[in-house]
C-alpha cells in the first residue's frame, strides 16, 4: 500500500520510498495483481480468442483465394486478355484487331463451349455434357494434364479409323459406365474416349456447370453438326500479348484501346486481373458474410468481456474500497484495472491470431481438392492486423463501462455495493469512449468492403444493432413482468421470479449472449429451409420435366409427332429464341447507359429474347398495354420492370438490339413482372410479331409429363435429333441443390461460432453471479429448504430465462429471414415451425444445463463457513 500512500496527500511521507523502480504506479499495481494468474479472466480470454480467431481465419482463407486468383490469373483465364461472344464467331473487324496482336508477336487461341448430349455407344446411356472444342494453340498458359499421360493434341487427333478423340472428366466415365477406349456419340460424330482429364487450367473461368466436361478438337466439333444458325455456343478468344506488352498497365491499356476501337462489338472482355469475376465476387461475398458473423461472435463475446470484468471487479470491491480509503483517486483505480484488462486482451488477441494464422495452413491438405483455384496458404498480415484491431477495440468497448462505474463510486458505496450493487452511469468521457469504440467497429466493417457489398454490410450491422436493442428491451421486459407478477403461492416460482430481477441478476447478460447467437442461427436455418423447400419441393412440382434446346424450325414437325405418340404428356410449350446484345437505350450506347450495379449485367454480352402475340405465362403486366394478337405495326417490345427501373426508363422509351449485325430499335410498350420460379420459359425482352419472325432462331421447348415416361421420351428425341440438347430438370435441380447444400453448410458452421461465443458468455454470466448464488442457497438451506426444492426453484428460473430468450430470438430471426426471402430474393415465404421449436427447446435446455451445473456446485457448499465470512 506504500505506493498508494505516496500519491495520497493525507498519507504523503508516511511510507518508505522504494528504489530502483521507474515503472509508473498504475503499471506496478496492475502487474502485482496479474501475478495471481488469470483466474476470473478465463471466459474473457476465451470469448476474445474465439472472435479474433474466427475473423483471422476467414480473412486468411479469403486472402489466399484472392491471391491465387491474382497470381494464377493468366492460367485461369487462359490468356492475358479474353473475349467471349455468344451465338457467333468474330466478324471481320474483330478478327483483324485480334490478328494484329498476333502479327506483333502475340498468340491467339479460340475455344467453343456449348451443352450437348453425350451418348455411350456400348450401353446407350446418355447425359448432358459441357462440350468444349479447342484449337491447336490451346492452352496459351498452363497445361491440360491427362490421366493417360498423353499430350492433348495427340489425344484429340483423328485416328486411323476416322474417329476423333475426346478427353472427359472422370464423372462422365462413372455416370455412363465407360472407360478409356470406349466410344461416345456427340451430335453426328462418334468420338473415342482417349483419357480422363486430371487438370483443365481454365475450367474455373467457365462458370457454373451442369454436366461433366467433354473436350474435343475444333475439327471434331465441325463433324458433330451441332453448330448451326442460332445454336447456343460460347466462343472464347484468348490473347497472349507480345513480350513487351504484358505488364499490368499495358494489359489495361490494351483493353481500353479495344473498347474504343470496337465499341459495338458486343463481346465480353476480361483480363488476367479479373480472370474469374464470378468466383472473385462469390469469395468476396462469402468472406464478407463470414467476417461479419465472426464480428458478431466477437461482439457477443464482448458481452462476456463485460461480464468477466464486472465479476472480477465484484471480487475486488474490498480492495478497491481500501485503495480509495488510502486516498487513491478514481483515475488511478481506472488505470490499474484497465491496464490489467488490456494486458489480458492482448494475450487473447495473440492466441486468436495464432489460431487464425494456423487454421488455413492446417486445413490446406483437406481443402486443396475442394477449392476452385490453385491456392497456397501462408501468413497474410492484412487479415491478422484487421482481426487484432477488431479484438482490441471490442475489448475497449466492453471494458470501459464497468471499470468507469467502479472508478466513480465512493469508498463507502463500494462497501455497500457488496450487498446491493448500485446502478449509475459513467462519466461522459467514458460513455463517449464506449460509443466511439463501437462506432469504430462499424466503420471498419463497412469501409473495408467493396462498393457492391457495402449496403449488405450496413444492413447486417443495422440488423445486429437492432437485435441488440430488442434483446436488451426483452431483458428489461422480463424483469418488469417478473416484478409485476407479485408473490405467487408456489415457493419455487416465487424464488424463480425474484431471481430474475434481483440486484446483480444475470438476466440481461443471458438474454444478450444467448439471444444474438440464436437469432443468427434461426435466420440462417429459415433461409436455408425456404430455399431448399423451393428448389427441392416446390420447383420440381411447378417446373417442366424437360427443356429441349437448339431445335431447328424444320425439326418442329417431327418433334411434335414424337410427342403425339408418347403417353403421359401433360403440357408442351414451344417458343422461338433469338440471341443478340442490347446495344443502345434511348440512343445511348450500352456502355454509356447509367445503370445500377445490379442491373448492368443485362447490358453486357448477348441476351435471349423472343416474340409473341400473347402475354407469356408467368408474366404480370404492370405498366402499359399488350399489343393486339393481329398487331402488324412498328416494332414494340415488352421489358421487365426491375431492369427498367435500374436503367431509369419506362413505357415510351426505346431499346436497340443487334441480330447478326442488324440493329433493330423498338419502343417499350409495356413493363412486366416475371415469376422466374415457375421454371417455365420467359425472357426479359418479348417483341411484337413481325419484327423477328425471319431472324435466325432456334426453338426452345418445355415438356411436362408423367415421370414414368421421361427416359423413353429423352431417348427418342435425342436419337432423332442429335443436335438437340435435352436438359432433364430433375438433374439440373440436383446440381443446384448440391451447390446450395455446400454453401449453407459452410455458413451454418460459421454461425456455430456465434453460438459457442454465446455459450461462453452464458457460462460467464452464470459464473459472475455464482457468489450470490452460493449465499442465497446457504440462506435457503438454513431456513429449511431441501436441496431438491432449491434446485427446482433455480431450474424454473433458468427455464423461464431460456424460454423467453428463445421466443424473442426466434421471432427476430424469423422476421430477418422473412425479409431476406421476400424482399431480397423475392421468393415465396413459408414458416417452418420445426426450426422454431428446436430453437426454443434447445435454448431452454442449454440455459437450464449451465445454470444447474453452477447451482449444484453452490448447493454443495457448507453453510457455516459462508455465513461466517459474510
Describe the role of every protein-language-model region.
Residues 477-616, 651-653, 657, 735, ...:
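Juxtamembrane segments of multi-pass membrane proteins
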Residues 2-51, 278-281, 329-330, 338, ...:
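N-terminal Sec/SRP start-transfer signal
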Residues 299, 303-309, 342-373, 382-408, ...:
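Small-residue-rich transmembrane alpha-helices
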Residues 2-299, 311-314, 330, 369, ...:
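Membrane transport/envelope proteins' first extracytoplasmic loop
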Residues 35-36, 40-45, 52-78, 88, ...:
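Alpha-helical transmembrane segments
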Residues 33-37, 279, 287, 303-345, ...:
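Interfacial "coupling" helices/loops that link adjacent transmembrane helices in transporter permeases
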Residues 125-174, 565-566, 570-651, 665:
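Short beta-strand boundary microenvironments
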Residues 408-423, 859-870:
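Short cytosolic juxtamembrane segments of multi-pass membrane proteins
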Amino acid at each position: 500500500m506504500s505506493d498508494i500512500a505516496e500519491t495520497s496527500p493525507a498519507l504523503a511521507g508516511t511510507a518508505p520510498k522504494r528504489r530502483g523502480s521507474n515503472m509508473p504506479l498504475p503499471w506496478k499495481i496492475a502487474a502485482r495483481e496479474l501475478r495471481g494468474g488469470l483466474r476470473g479472466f478465463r471466459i474473457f480470454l476465451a470469448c476474445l480468442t474465439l472472435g479474433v480467431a474466427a475473423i483471422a481465419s476467414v480473412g486468411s482463407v479469403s486472402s489466399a483465394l484472392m491471391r491465387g486468383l491474382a497470381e494464377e490469373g493468366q492460367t485461369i483465364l487462359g490468356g492475358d486478355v479474353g473475349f467471349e461472344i455468344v451465338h457467333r464467331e468474330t466478324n471481320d473487324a474483330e478478327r483483324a484487331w485480334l490478328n494484329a496482336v498476333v502479327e506483333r508477336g502475340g498468340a491467339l487461341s479460340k475455344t467453343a463451349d456449348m451443352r450437348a448430349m453425350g451418348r455411350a455407344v456400348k450401353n446407350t446411356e446418355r447425359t448432358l455434357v459441357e462440350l468444349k472444342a479447342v484449337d491447336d494453340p490451346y492452352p496459351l498458359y498452363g497445361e491440360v494434364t491427362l490421366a493417360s499421360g498423353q499430350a492433348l493434341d495427340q489425344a484429340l487427333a483423328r485416328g486411323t479409323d476416322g474417329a476423333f478423340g475426346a478427353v472427359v472428366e472422370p464423372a462422365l466415365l462413372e455416370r455412363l459406365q465407360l472407360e478409356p477406349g470406349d466410344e461416345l456419340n456427340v451430335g453426328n460424330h462418334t468420338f473415342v474416349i482417349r483419357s480422363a482429364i486430371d487438370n483443365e487450367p481454365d475450367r474455373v473461368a467457365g462458370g457454373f456447370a451442369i454436366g461433366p466436361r467433354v473436350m474435343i478438337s475444333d475439327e471434331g466439333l465441325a463433324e458433330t453438326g451441332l453448330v448451326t444458325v442460332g445454336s447456343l455456343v460460347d466462343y472464347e478468344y484468348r490473347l497472349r500479348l507480345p513480350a513487351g506488352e504484358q505488364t499490368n498497365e499495358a494489359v489495361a491499356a490494351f483493353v481500353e484501346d479495344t473498347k474504343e476501337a470496337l465499341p459495338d462489338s458486343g463481346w465480353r472482355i476480361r483480363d488476367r486481373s479479373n480472370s474469374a469475376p464470378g468466383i472473385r465476387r462469390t469469395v468476396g461475398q462469402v468472406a464478407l458474410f463470414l467476417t461479419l458473423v465472426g464480428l458478431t461472435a466477437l461482439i457477443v463475446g464482448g458481452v462476456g468481456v463485460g461480464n468477466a470484468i464486472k465479476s472480477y471487479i465484484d471480487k475486488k470491491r474490498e480492495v478497491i474500497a481500501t485503495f480509495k480509503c488510502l486516498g487513491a483517486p478514481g483515475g488511478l483505480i481506472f488505470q490499474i484495472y484497465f491496464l490489467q484488462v488490456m494486458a489480458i486482451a492482448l494475450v487473447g488477441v495473440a492466441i486468436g491470431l495464432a489460431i487464425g494464422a494456423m487454421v488455413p495452413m492446417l486445413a490446406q491438405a483437406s481443402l486443396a481438392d475442394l477449392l476452385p483455384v490453385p491456392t497456397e496458404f501462408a501468413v497474410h498480415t492484412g487479415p491478422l492486423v484487421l482481426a487484432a484491431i477488431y479484438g482490441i477495440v471490442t475489448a475497449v468497448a466492453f471494458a470501459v463501462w464497468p471499470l468507469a462505474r467502479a472508478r466513480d463510486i465512493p469508498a463507502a458505496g463500494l462497501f455497500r455495493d457488496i450487498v446491493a450493487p448500485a446502478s449509475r452511469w459513467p462519466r461522459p468521457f467514458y460513455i463517449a469512449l464506449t460509443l466511439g469504440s463501437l462506432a469504430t467497429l462499424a466503420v471498419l466493417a463497412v469501409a473495408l468492403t467493396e462498393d457492391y457489398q457495402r449496403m449488405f454490410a450496413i444492413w447486417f450491422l443495422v440488423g445486429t444493432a437492432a437485435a441488440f436493442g430488442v434483446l436488451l428491451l426483452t431483458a428489461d421486459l422480463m424483469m418488469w413482468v417478473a416484478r409485476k407478477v407479485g408473490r405467487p403461492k408456489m415457493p419455487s416460482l416465487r424464488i424463480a421470479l425474484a431471481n430474475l430481477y434481483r440486484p446483480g441478476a444475470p438476466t440481461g447478460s443471458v438474454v444478450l449472449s444467448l439471444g444474438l447467437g440464436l437469432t443468427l442461427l434461426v435466420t440462417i436455418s429459415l433461409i436455408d429451409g425456404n430455399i431448399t423447400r423451393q428448389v427441392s419441393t416446390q420447383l420440381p412440382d411447378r417446373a417442366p420435366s424437360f427443356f429441349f434446346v437448339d431445335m431447328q424450325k424444320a425439326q418442329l414437325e417431327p418433334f411434335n409427332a414424337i410427342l403425339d405418340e408418347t403417353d403421359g404428356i401433360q403440357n408442351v410449350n414451344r417458343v422461338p429464341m433469338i440471341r443478340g446484345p442490347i446495344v443502345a437505350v434511348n440512343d445511348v450506347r450500352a456502355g454509356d447507359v447509367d445503370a445500377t450495379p445490379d442491373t448492368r449485367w443485362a447490358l453486357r454480352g448477348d441476351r435471349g429474347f423472343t416474340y409473341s402475340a400473347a402475354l407469356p405465362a408467368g408474366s404480370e403486366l404492370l405498366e402499359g398495354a399488350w399489343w393486339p394478337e393481329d398487331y402488324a405495326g412498328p416494332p414494340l417490345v415488352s421489358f421487365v420492370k426491375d431492369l427498367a427501373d435500374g436503367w431509369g426508363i419506362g413505357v415510351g422509351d426505346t431499346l436497340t438490339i443487334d441480330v447478326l449485325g442488324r440493329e433493330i430499335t423498338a419502343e417499350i410498350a409495356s413493363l412486366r413482372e416475371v415469376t422466374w420460379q415457375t421454371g417455365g420459359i420467359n425472357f426479359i425482352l418479348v417483341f411484337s410479331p413481325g419484327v423477328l419472325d425471319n431472324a435466325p432462331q432456334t426453338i426452345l421447348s418445355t415438356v411436362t409429363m408423367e415421370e414414368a415416361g421421361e427416359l423413353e421420351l429423352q431417348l427418342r428425341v435425342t436419337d432423332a435429333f442429335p443436335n438437340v440438347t435435352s436438359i432433364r430438370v430433375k438433374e439440373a435441380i440436383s446440381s443446384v441443390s448440391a451447390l446450395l447444400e455446400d454453401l449453407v453448410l459452410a455458413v451454418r458452421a460459421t454461425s456455430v461460432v456465434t453460438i459457442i461465443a454465446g455459450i461462453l458468455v452464458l457460462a460467464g454470466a452464470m459464473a459472475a453471479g455464482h457468489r450470490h448464488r452460493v449465499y442465497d442457497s446457504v440462506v435457503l438451506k438454513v431456513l429449511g429448504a431441501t436441496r431438491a426444492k432449491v434446485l427446482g426453484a433455480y431450474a424454473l428460473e433458468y427455464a423461464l430465462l431460456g424460454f423467453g430468450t428463445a421466443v424473442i430470438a426466434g421471432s427476430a430471426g424469423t422476421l430477418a429471414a422473412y425479409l431476406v426471402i421476400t424482399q431480397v430474393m423475392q421468393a415465396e415465404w413459408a414458416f417452418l415451425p420445426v426450426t422454431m421449436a428446436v430453437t426454443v427447446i434447445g435454448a431452454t435446455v442449454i440455459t437450464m444445463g449451465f445454470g444447474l451445473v453452477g447451482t449444484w456446485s453452490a448447493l454443495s457448499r457448507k453453510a457455516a463457513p459462508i455465513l461466517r465470512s459474510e
